[in-house]
């Protein structure tokens, strides 16, 4: 079976879901089921039992593995505090590390992310850091011992698709020196997820594209199928693009050549 690992955790599904932006918990549960997701990210701030509007979230997520995230953290210090709280509330050792000081474009801070990752690893967390598509930073995080790296495809919630493809191709080339690569943020269509998986990267994380669809469960199923198709295409070994056309049927033995009738075989 084609499984993958995040630290010691073995997973079958390569589609991770976010839990935000759904109309209600019932729709969220239907989407999770349609995606056959094993892991769902959840903001530590939403897990707090007295958080307004979020009562019942943990109950709604029963049966899946929770991945607490540090959404809302603007500095390494804030991220570490949220990660500790997430471990206390969920009992999970792993954490999706997000350090985002920029409220306009929601781009992650590479220096604070690196600093927070180092501290959390020292505290025995399994760290899954959200980051820009920076291969040098990815290798620095890998050297610290992060469980994954999570480069963005486009800004969070934009739905722009794989705008960073050229840089993600570098991640695919360097996979042997990296932990699992999970592409996170900006995917708007199932075809975007398939494109990422065709590169040979390990998984994708999707939230807004599913939660804001007119039919979230149907879109979740579409993303699941796209991830599976992209992964199978990668494993099948795609053909290499050519610089010129190549006929799919042999031309030898036909009465005409591409430049006209063969000698002696014109109209009778």
UniProtKB/Swiss-Prot annotation:
It comes from the Bacteria. Pathway: Cofactor biosynthesis; thiamine diphosphate biosynthesis. CDD domains: ThiG. Its main location: cytoplasm. Residues 258-268 have a biased composition (Pro residues). GO terms for molecular function: thiazole synthase activity. The active site is at residue 96. It is found in: Cytoplasm. Keywords: Cytoplasm, Schiff base, Thiamine biosynthesis, Transferase. One of its GO terms (cellular component) is cytoplasm. Residues 238-268 are annotated as: Disordered. It catalyses: [ThiS sulfur-carrier protein]-C-terminal-Gly-aminoethanethioate + 2-iminoacetate + 1-deoxy-D-xylulose 5-phosphate = [ThiS sulfur-carrier protein]-C-terminal Gly-Gly + 2-[(2R,5Z)-2-carboxy-4-methylthiazol-5(2H)-ylidene]ethyl phosphate + 2 H2O + H(+). Its EC number is 2.8.1.10. Transmembrane segments: none annotated. 1-deoxy-D-xylulose 5-phosphate binds at residues 157, 185-186, 207-208. GO terms for biological process: thiamine diphosphate biosynthetic process. It is an enzyme of class 2 (transferase). InterPro entries: Aldolase_TIM (IPR013785), Thiazole_synthase_ThiG (IPR033983), ThiG (IPR008867). Belongs to the ThiG family. Catalyzes the rearrangement of 1-deoxy-D-xylulose 5-phosphate (DXP) to produce the thiazole phosphate moiety of thiamine. Sulfur is provided by the thiocarboxylate moiety of the carrier protein ThiS. In vitro, sulfur can be provided by H(2)S. Homotetramer. Forms heterodimers with either ThiH or ThiS. This is Thiazole synthase. It comes from Thermus thermophilus (strain ATCC 27634 / DSM 579 / HB8).
């Amino acid at each position: 079976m084609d499984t993958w690992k995040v630290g010691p955790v073995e997973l079958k599904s390569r589609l991770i879901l976010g839990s935000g932006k759904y109309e209600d918990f019932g729709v969220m549960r239907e989407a999770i089921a349609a995606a056959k997701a094993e892991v769902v990210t959840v903001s530590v701030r939403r897990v707090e039992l007295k958080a307004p509007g979020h009562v019942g979230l943990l109950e709604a997520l029963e049966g899946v593995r929770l991945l607490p995230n540090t959404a809302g953290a603007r500095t390494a210090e804030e991220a570490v505090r949220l990660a500790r709280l997430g471990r206390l509330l969920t009992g999970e050792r792993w954490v999706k590390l997000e350090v985002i000081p920029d409220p306009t474009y929601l781009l992650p801070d590479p220096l604070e992310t690196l600093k927070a990752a180092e501290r959390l690893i020292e505290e025995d967390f399994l760290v899954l850091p959200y980051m820009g598509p920076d291969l040098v930073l990815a290798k620095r995080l890998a050297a610290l011992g992060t469980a994954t790296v999570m480069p963005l495809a486009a800004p969070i919630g934009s739905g722009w698709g794989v705008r960073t493809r050229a840089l993600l191709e570098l991640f695919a080339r360097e996979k042997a020196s990296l932990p699992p690569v999970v592409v996170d943020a900006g995917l708007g269509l199932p075809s975007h997820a398939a494109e990422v998986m065709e590169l040979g990267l390990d998984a994708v994380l999707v939230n807004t594209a599913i939660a804001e669809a007119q039919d979230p469960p149907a879109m979740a199923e579409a993303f699941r199928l796209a991830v599976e198709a992209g992964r199978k295409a990668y494993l099948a070994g795609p053909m290499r693009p050519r610089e010129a056309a190549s006929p799919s049927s042999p031309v030898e033995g036909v009465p005409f050549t591409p430049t006209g009738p063969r000698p002696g075989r014109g109209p009778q």
